[in-house]
Design a protein with these regions (language model features):
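Conserved "HGTGT" condensation-loop signature of ketosynthase/thiolase-family condensing enzymes
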Residues: 1-142, 148-154, 162-168, 174-212
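Short-chain dehydrogenase/reductase
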Residues: 157
Length: 212
C-alpha cells in the first residue's frame, strides 16, 4: 500500500516506485533474505555493496555517508529514465557526515587550528549527502535535510508532504558509524562488535501507476 502523510487533517498517499537499503548484511536483496530467515542485520555496510552502483569518480571523492546516500538513491531509482527521476531530495539523519567531521577537526587540531581540508569542511555539514544526490539526479526542487534524533526519517517524510507538491521525490534515511565519534554520541556503540550503520531510500510519487 501507499505511504501516507497527514496534512491539514487529510491523509495524502505517496506510492513507492523504487526502494533500496544498505545494512550490515549488504544490499537490498541480501538484507531481505536475512530478514526472511530471522537473522541479525548488525554490522557496518560492506564497502563493496556501498560502491558497486557508483561512478568511479564518486567512489574516489566521497566519504562514507555521502557515498551511502548516493548509492541508496541510485539503487532506488534504478531503471528510471531522464524525465522520470526525482525532482526533490528529503534526507533524514541523526548524526550526519561523521567521517568528514572527524577528519576536518583532526587536521585542524594537528595544525594548531591553522589549516584543514576545505573538502572535509564542505562534506561535514549535514546536508552535504543530500546535495550530492541532488547534483547526481539534477533535482531542481527542494533539497531538505532533517535531523531529529530517532525521528529524522519520519520528519523528512512529513517535510516532503508539505513541500514536494506533485513532483516525484527521493526519501532517504541513513547514518554512518565512525570509530572515533560514534561512541561519544552513543555509549552503546563503544565496542567494535556493536559498530553498525546503514540506511534506506524510497522513490515516491503521488501517482499510483507503475508503483511497486
Amino acid at each position: 500500500g501507499p505511504v501516507r502523510v497527514r496534512e491539514n487533517g487529510e491523509s495524502i498517499p505517496f506510492y513507492v516506485h523504487g526502494r533500496s537499503c544498505l545494512t550490515g548484511a549488504g544490499d537490498t536483496d541480501r538484507t531481505l533474505d536475512m530478514l526472511s530467515r530471522g537473522e541479525n542485520l548488525k554490522g557496518m555496510v560492506p564497502s563493496s555493496d556501498m560502491s558497486k552502483h557508483l561512478p568511479a569518480k564518486a567512489v574516489r571523492r566521497l566519504k562514507r555517508l555521502s557515498r551511502m546516500v548516493l548509492s541508496l538513491g541510485i539503487s532506488a531509482c534504478a531503471g528510471k529514465r531522464e524525465g522520470n527521476l526525482p525532482r526533490a531530495i528529503f534526507f533524514g539523519t541523526r548524526w550526519g557526515a561523521l567521517s568528514e567531521t572527524h577528519d576536518f577537526l583532526a587536521k585542524l587540531f594537528e595544525t594548531d587550528e591553522r589549516l584543514s581540508s576545505p573538502t572535509d569542511f564542505i562534506g561535514s555539514v549535514h546536508n552535504a549527502p543530500a546535495g550530492q544526490a541532488a547534483i547526481h539526479f539534477h533535482a531542481p526542487g527542494p533539497n531538505i535535510t532533517i535531523t531529529g534524533c530517532n525521528g529524522s526519517f519520519e520528519q523528512a517524510l512529513f517535510s516532503a508532504g508539505l513541500l514536494c507538491g506533485e513532483d516525484p521525490f527521493l526519501l532517504v534515511g541513513a547514518d554512518e558509524y565512525n570509530e572515533h565519534l560514534s561512541p561519544l554520541f552513543d555509549p552503546e556503540a563503544s565496542s567494535a562488535e556493536r559498530a553498525t550503520d546503514g540506511g534506506g531510500a524510497l522513490y515516491l510519487k503521488r501517482k499510483k501507476e507503475g508503483a511497486t
